[in-house]
């Protein structure tokens, strides 16, 4: 009897760009030796839309509706970073009420983003039930967004010097009710998932990143904090009104997929704490800076006849960006979202460089999956949390 023939050559497998676990149009060229991953090459660019070049041919106000298409699951953060840049260039003060409203919207958006990470992540490793649970809570957040901004997604709510509109009557009470309800749901998630032996088998010790390694790769957000580095831009940069609230940076030291899950689950609870404090302490006053018209420093009576009335409460659509360089950043759900802006005394930016957290965090994927099993690719990729809209831009 002859022995069965064996093959020693490697197999190359294409995963994506339509694979349901790719979280968008990501393509992985995976080299396999049986079930063992030898190499993995991510192929990007299927969702490239030229967002940086579009920004260089638009005024800031014209460009605002575009930015919600970067990370379309956390649109408040892309809006925040877009208005923060000209606010710093023009030294524009944001009223306290507007700053509190911004914090509330940002943290609600963080919770919604983490929820839509949790559901697909659990589905990737075989747990379908949480995928349906998270839409129950996410729907309530989108109802709050719709009541305040008029849109469930792509809100276009942030403005230079404030926000587009004040909170509607009764919105604060509804948001407080949601916070109380959501805390019970997070407890339910933890009971259902955290100590589940099958879940722990899939994530514990999988995709380990050390603290120094995370820094060297430029990782940020939960990817960095799960490796033992307590770095959160809300604490570091003191932007908006985060210093006025009592909350803590959530972190773990193990650096594996389980640690990244625990960081995000804890961050949702901390976000609720911030929202509750902001809702209870929100002050009266304007929701936008009524002095933004000072962008134009040149006194021109003829220009003033028409346009002073036109921009009495809004920034001019054609204000000039001063000739300087500026880097601004916020702590988005996926990590550090930044913009490098170069003004050239024109109405369009000379350079608008986007620093998306998902693009940077994705670079470590080939190193994490080498010498792992094929099934672990889904676990590791899901724990990174990427959205191809911001990766490809």
Swiss-Prot record:
Disulfide bonds: none annotated. One of its GO terms (cellular component) is chloroplast thylakoid membrane. Its EC number is 7.1.1.-. This is NAD(P)H-quinone oxidoreductase subunit H, chloroplastic. It catalyses: a plastoquinone + NADH + (n+1) H(+)(in) = a plastoquinol + NAD(+) + n H(+)(out); a plastoquinone + NADPH + (n+1) H(+)(in) = a plastoquinol + NADP(+) + n H(+)(out). It is found in: Plastid, Chloroplast thylakoid membrane. It comes from the Eukaryota. Keywords: Chloroplast, Membrane, NAD, NADP, Plastid, Plastoquinone, Quinone, Thylakoid, Translocase, Transport. It is a peripheral membrane protein. One of its GO terms (biological process) is photosynthesis, light reaction. It is an enzyme of class 7 (translocase). The gene is ndhH. One of its GO terms (molecular function) is NAD binding.
């Amino acid at each position: 009897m002859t022995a069965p023939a064996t093959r020693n050559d490697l197999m190359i497998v294409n995963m994506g760009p339509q694979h349901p676990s790719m979280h968008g149009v990501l393509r992985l060229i995976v080299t396999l030796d049986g079930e063992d991953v030898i190499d993995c090459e991510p192929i990007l660019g299927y969702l490239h839309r030229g967002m940086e070049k579009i920004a260089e041919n638009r005024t800031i106000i014209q460009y605002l509706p575009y930015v919600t298409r970067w990370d379309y699951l956390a649109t408040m953060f892309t809006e925040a970073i877009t208005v923060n840049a000209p606010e710093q260039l023009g030294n524009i003060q944001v009223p306290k009420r507007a700053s509190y409203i911004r914090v509330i919207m940002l943290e609600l958006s963080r919770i919604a983003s983490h929820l839509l990470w949790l559901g697909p992540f659990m589905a990737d490793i075989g747990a379908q039930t949480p995928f349906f649970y998270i839409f129950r809570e996410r729907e309530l957040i989108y109802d709050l967004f719709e009541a305040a901004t008029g849109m469930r997604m792509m809100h276009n709510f942030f403005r230079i010097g404030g926000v587009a509109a004040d909170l509607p009557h009764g919105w604060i009470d509804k948001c407080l009710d949601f916070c109380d309800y959501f805390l019970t749901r997070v407890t339910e998630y933890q009971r259902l998932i955290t100590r589940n032996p099958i879940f722990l088998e899939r994530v514990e010790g999988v995709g380990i990143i050390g603290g120094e390694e995370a820094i060297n790769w430029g990782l940020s957000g939960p990817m960095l904090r799960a490796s033992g580095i307590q770095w959160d831009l809300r604490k570091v940069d003191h932007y908006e009104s985060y210093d006025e609230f009592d909350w803590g940076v959530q972190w773990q030291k193990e650096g594996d997929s389980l640690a990244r899950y625990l960081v995000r689950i804890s961050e949702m609870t901390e976000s609720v704490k911030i929202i509750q404090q902001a809702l209870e302490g929100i002050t009266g006053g304007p929701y936008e800076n009524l002095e933004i018209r000072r962008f134009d420093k040149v006194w021109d009576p003829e220009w003033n006849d028409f346009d002073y009335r036109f921009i009495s409460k809004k920034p001019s659509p054609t204000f000039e960006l001063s000739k300087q360089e500026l880097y601004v950043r916020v702590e988005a759900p996926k990590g550090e979202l930044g913009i490098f802006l170069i003004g050239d005394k024109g109405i369009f930016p000379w350079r608008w460089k986007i620093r998306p957290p998902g693009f940077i965090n994705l670079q470590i994927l080939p190193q994490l999956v080498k010498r792992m099993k094929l099934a672990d690719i889904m676990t590791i990729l899901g724990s990174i949390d990427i959205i191809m809209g911001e990766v490809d831009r």
